[in-house]
From Swiss-Prot:
Full protein name: Orotate phosphoribosyltransferase
Cofactors required: Mg(2+)
Keywords, sorted A to Z: Glycosyltransferase, Magnesium, Pyrimidine biosynthesis, Transferase
Lineage, broadest ranks: Bacteria, Bacillati, Bacillota, Bacilli, Lactobacillales
NCBIfam families: pyrE
Keyword Protein transport: no
Length: 209
């Protein structure tokens, strides 16, 4: 079983992911979605957490061997990033969504050296907007952002476009395609449900029609 498949299995088992193609969720953007993901739940399950953190470390070593600092996005990327940095014996910082409105007004907490090679950790990629904002903030502080590594992606076309335009490499430990395949195999969804989930990936607006 691949890492992507193992993580998809765990996310379903611990109910970090819910699939309801016949009774969709409403995202903050207003989009009706057959999937809801809360990867923060993974922190409460040591087996799942260990699988994810080791997957992060292996992926970073394989794709970004020159990394010098790990950054986590606030708030979901912070615990994962801190554990990864500890496992890799690397410095850790975290990046706020916007600068503090008091004190020194920091957006990045921790010390980033000019030219320091950084990998940013995120838990979930939908369109990628928030983590790309974090990458831009890190670049302004002088970091050399090598890429973003995340637990899971919805594989939305908008995300691919955004990362391409930003010139930032994205790698995820698991993904939507893998998850719905595992969900069907393990009886979480019906054939009709799988069909709807595949349609959502192709067209997030008209998939129910």
């Amino acid at each position: 079983m691949t890492l992507a498949s193992q993580i998809a299995t765990q996310l379903l088992d611990i109910k970090a992911v819910y699939l309801k193609p016949e009774d969709p969720f409403t995202w903050a953007s207003g989009i009706k979605s057959p999937i809801y993901t809360d990867n923060r739940v993974t922190l409460s399950y040591p087996k799942t957490r260990d699988l994810i953190e080791n997957g992060f470390v292996e992926t970073i070593r394989a794709h970004f061997p020159e990394v010098e600092v790990i950054a986590g996005t606030a708030t979901a990327g912070i615990p994962h990033g801190a554990i990864i940095a500890d496992k890799m014996t690397l410095p850790f910082v975290y990046i706020r969504s916007k600068p503090k409105d008091h004190g020194a007004g920091n957006q990045i907490e921790g010390r980033v050296l000019k030219g320091q090679k950084m990998v940013i950790i995120e838990d979930l990629i939908s369109t990628g907007g928030s983590v790309l904002d974090a990458a831009a903030a890190a670049s302004r502080e002088g970091a050399d952002v090598l890429g973003v590594v995340a637990i899971f992606t919805y594989e939305l076309p908008k995300a691919s476009q955004n990362f391409k335009e930003a010139g930032i490499k994205l790698i995820t430990l698991s993904n939507y395609t893998e998850l719905i395949a595992v969900a069907k195999l393990q009886g979480y969804i019906t054939n009709d449900g799988l069909h709807l989930l595949k349609k959502f990936k192709e067209d997030q607006v008209n998939w129910q029609q």
